[in-house]
Amino acid sequence: DALPISGMPGPYIAIIYNALCDSAQGVAFSPAIGYNVPCINVQRGIAMSCDLLVGSTGFVGGNLLAKHTFAAECHSSDITAQYGTRPDLCVYAGVPAAMFLANADPEADLAVMRAARENIRQIAPKRLVLISSIAVLADSRGVYEDSPAQDTEGLPAYGKNRLQLERWVREDFPDALIVRLPALYGAGIRKNFLFDLHTITPAMLRPEKYSELAAKSPLVKSAYTLADNGFYKLNGTADQAALRAFFAANDFNALAFTDARSRYQFYNLGRLWSDMEAARTADVKLLHLCTPPVSAAEVYAAVTGKTDWHNELPKPPFDYDLRSRHAALLGGSGDYLCTKQQELDDITRFMRSWRD
């Protein structure tokens, strides 16, 4: 129950708050220095469940914060302040999602996974939710939570290292809930096909493509700068609306990087908190949050109303088809959280309400 604290003497607050938040955690209130209890939401003036969000400034973390007020939150630069706090619940959404960087330097990425394991150990939560990825599977087609473990041979470093973190977490916290996410959309989206469909403007260009387009347009010439990785990167100085109009009218734009035949599973982060809570209540240990596979061409048609996009790349298209045993628990049916039409309708609503 909520406890009003306005006007209450400091020593009484200390006694009440330390009792509520389990002073054995080693985190206490001192009237002399103020509130030092992560599990208390002082701004709201009420005692909250002792929960912590790691990764509060990230894409997933930001969407979780929009749905739930955590008693404490942190990110990579201040996470050590949470060591030893032993929250009732820690949602760890602080694993980097930069696939390109992970695959370019696997050892450095594995070191990040080791650091994540140590962070969780030092925080020592009573309950843990680890936000993971569909990328831990070399082939997601027809895979359920209870499917046999796959061979990791050929699995890119990004997926292999995050699978290792899952295994470490299971060793250290046997009752943890591990959540595997597919392609995502929600507030703050900055990548994937939906982002490309909205922006149209490529974030990076190969040198030869930059030279070709810069020769056609002074706007493109000034909009990109050569980066350390050898690509030309969007620098943000050009008129974005004019740049978008240029690429929308050009045969080459951000959509050129996606095969129209590729099938993805798009999950709305707006429902993540409620889905996690339902799974935790049911004591689920591994959760696949999966919607039906939809092709990029189907998404394009649903959003734009056009059927004139048929981009095909030399490499085989992506084909994701993760399944879940817990779909019914979360309001779905069969193996998925919704129908394909419901997924396309929700994506369309999101895309049409998007504001830069």
Model feature map: region roles:
Residues L155-L177, P182:
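Active-site Tyr-X1-5-Lys
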Residues P106, D151-L163, Q265-F266:
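Short-chain dehydrogenase/reductase
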Residues A28, Y35-N36:
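Short, positively charged and aromatic/hydrophobic N-terminal segments
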Residues D175-Q265, R271:
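NAD(P)-dependent short-chain dehydrogenase/reductase
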Residues D51-H68:
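N-terminal Rossmann NAD(P)H-binding glycine-rich loop of SDR-like oxidoreductase domains
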Residues T80-K126, L130-V143:
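NAD(P)H-binding glycine-rich loop region in Rossmannoid oxidoreductase-like domains
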Residues D1-L3:
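Short, small-residue-biased leader/transition segments that mark boundaries at the very start
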Residues F252, D259, Y267-A328, K340-D356:
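Mid/C-terminal beta-alpha module of Rossmann-like enzyme folds, strongest
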